[in-house]
């Protein structure tokens, strides 16, 4: 997700059409224990013993490779390109041949997407009101690590910090150490998960709610994202995608507490193309028309994401920063101080140019690193990404998919049964 730099006068603060059953989980049935051999009858012994609940064993997550030993992973959803000028691509044998030459490249994305689907299924079935943000982040990220069978290495694993932005916070929030924020029944939480394999990042997000009063907000954003996916393709102008997205998104409104709110595109948030080990790589995909006549090209990978809001439809940075990433092309910059050099070595060895958060540094045993981290930010070696917010009291939602522009068709690689 990328942001625009324009800044209007309004002051303000990353979806799935999902309903989670917040009722209490079913209690496992109880069984009668066997009587002890102390001369008592089985009945007497059973009456004196307390009934014991069956212990429910948690299913252990195993590496995704175990499910696909041949290394061939499920394909995503195939869509034909929207422009008539591209109709020949569907039947072109030459284009199919070119696509096969990049098979390993595509398999990395498909592996990451299958991990993503399994992780978000676990998240959707496990997250409940009352959990704190660190519990939720750990649930998701530890699942990614287990399926990838890598502990956040540069080979495969977490593509970026899990976004868990609540309500008017649209993106770039994940808990830092000590954060006590708890998920409430009336919250609107954007769940943004990244998985990478050999630097090929699958970026996909949904919004989780428990109260059906947000249904129209979620539907608006989900339909807008699907519109962006449908309109995207080789030779399509970025401006035209934004125009189509806005038309769908802003045809919706939401009633809340007796008041009707128009649902607005958050106009300074965009989709983006994805590079190797780079979550943002050059082009941005607007969600409103912006005059950008740049075209999508064959072989590119894009994250098509849209954000809707009941607020001003514009976000600004606010709050404690948790997200960071090393800027590419900064190896020649002089590193300010020994502690900053040491921290930079840790960043290079564990993340490269993939985004990361403070919790990941904590997990690696780093401590007292904030001064050195701020020095790297000021030197331009590391980029900080603070939370971005719409006006307080508003609600924001997000849906996102990763698409692959094959020579003959596009593949919505992150598509699942859920969204």
Curated annotation (Swiss-Prot):
Metal-binding recorded as keyword: yes
GO terms classed as biological process: protein maturation; proteolysis
InterPro entries in UniProt: Creatinase/aminopeptidase-like, Met_Aminopeptidase_Type2, Pept_M24, Pept_M24_MAP, Pept_M24A_MAP2, Pept_M24A_MAP2_BS, WH-like_DNA-bd_sf, WH_DNA-bd_sf
One cellular component (GO) term of this entry: cytoplasm
One Pfam family recorded for the sequence: Peptidase_M24
Coiled-coil ranges from the UniProt annotation: none
Compositional bias annotation for Acidic residues: 30-41
Essential cofactor(s): Co(2+); Zn(2+); Mn(2+); Fe(2+)
Record's compositionally biased regions (Basic residues): 48-61
Comp. bias (Basic and acidic residues): 11-29
Enzyme class, spelled out: hydrolase
Similarity section: Belongs to the peptidase M24A family. Methionine aminopeptidase eukaryotic type 2 subfamily.
Stored PANTHER family: METHIONINE AMINOPEPTIDASE 2
Name used for this protein in its record: Methionine aminopeptidase 2
Originating organism: Debaryomyces hansenii (strain ATCC 36239 / CBS 767 / BCRC 21394 / JCM 1990 / NBRC 0083 / IGC 2968) (Yeast)
